[in-house]
Amino acid sequence: MSNGSHSSVQLKSSTYLSKPTFHFAAGLLSGLTSSILLQPADLLKTRVQQSRETAALLPTIRSILASPHPIQGLWRGTLPSALRTGFGSALYFTSLNTLRTAVAADDPGYLFRGGHGSKPQNGNSPSGVSASSALPKLSHTANLITGAVARVAAGFVMMPVTVLKVRYESDYYAYRSLWGAAKDIVRHEGVRGLFAGFGATAIRDAPYAGLYVVFYEQSKRSLASLLGASSPSARSTPTEQQKSPPSTASINFISGALAAGLATTITNPFDVVKTRVQLMPSKYKNMMRATALMLREDGMRSLFGGLGLRMGRKALSSALAWTVYEELIMWAEKRWAEEQRDVKGVL
């Protein structure tokens, strides 16, 4: 009897410990998938934003395709991009889940109007979990704040990789390797150079991530209601899941694309400023100076350089990343729920 009890305790303990780890792994996989597939769009965005000619997309594409190694040229910078997006997504999703779960567990609905938090019971997900995901369902205000905080924290940790990615993708620098780029930056700009543009990045990422989560969750609810779909949760039976057209994945994918398009349009000026500061820190120095110079030299249009590319890439990357992440987490939640039921059945 004691052995059975000990096994039960071990299983529950491993379940609690595995959840943050799996959120990290799911975020890493989703980030790697989207970054590798969409690297050409990210490279083109960087090249377009570095130019004072905001309509330089076609010449940039022709230049790359005319090079001796066009395929390699389109995927230049894949390694730093994959590292940044992969581990950045892992840190972001893990932090976001931790924050949202903590908010839901403390039941702060009276602080965040419309919140539906509640304490987890018996090791299961909080009752505030949305039907379309394993994440807690919060109010718009709570979604905005948790999304912004999680993104800025992950962005700070990954900022050196982001700077290396931007410099390596740009044709302003002739770096032969990432290690060579890192040594050159530290030699000429100090460690501070590895964090160039963090202010603009934080100001871009905080509202983007917050708005994205708000738009994403609202879009999922609206689409599910409009299409009459009840997306499967960890507690759904196989029969109930078969009666859920369209699938959870399709709702999450469409919602991710729509949310990214809206959030990207609103925050694009910050992205352009960030790119200029990271590429030419000696000229632009900081966000305020960069914005003033860009408006004086190139006009308002310069703040929306690369918008089409960024919107297309963000829509696809966010839709892919969030769909893969949500599906992996829901799969894991179902497996953990089944394990708990099996253990209870044995006991």
Curated annotation (Swiss-Prot):
Solcar repeat spans: 18-102, 138-222, 247-331
Q: Name one Pfam family in it.
A: Mito_carr
Keyword list (alphabetical) reads: Membrane, Mitochondrion, Mitochondrion inner membrane, Repeat, Transmembrane, Transmembrane helix, Transport
Cellular component GO terms, alphabetically? mitochondrial inner membrane
**InterPro entries annotated for this entry?**
Hem25/SLC25A38 (IPR030847), Mitochondrial_sb/sol_carrier (IPR018108), Mt_carrier_dom_sf (IPR023395)
What domain of life is recorded for the organism? Eukaryota
Q: Cite the PROSITE patterns for this sequence.
A: SOLCAR (PS50920)
Compartments, as annotated in UniProt: Mitochondrion inner membrane
One of the record's GO molecular function terms: glycine transmembrane transporter activity
Offer one example of a GO biological process linked to this entry. Answer: glycine import into mitochondrion
Annotated catalysed reactions: glycine(in) = glycine(out)
Note the topology in the membrane: Multi-pass membrane protein
Q: Where are the transmembrane segments?
A: 24-49, 77-103, 144-169, 197-220, 251-277, 306-324
Which family is it part of?
Belongs to the mitochondrial carrier (TC 2.A.29) family. SLC25A38 subfamily.
* Function statement: Mitochondrial glycine transporter that imports glycine into the mitochondrial matrix. Plays an important role in providing glycine for the first enzymatic step in heme biosynthesis, the condensation of glycine with succinyl-CoA to produce 5-aminolevulinate (ALA) in the mitochondrial matrix.
PANTHER family linked to this entry: MITOCHONDRIAL GLYCINE TRANSPORTER
Please identify the protein, giving its name as recorded: Mitochondrial glycine transporter
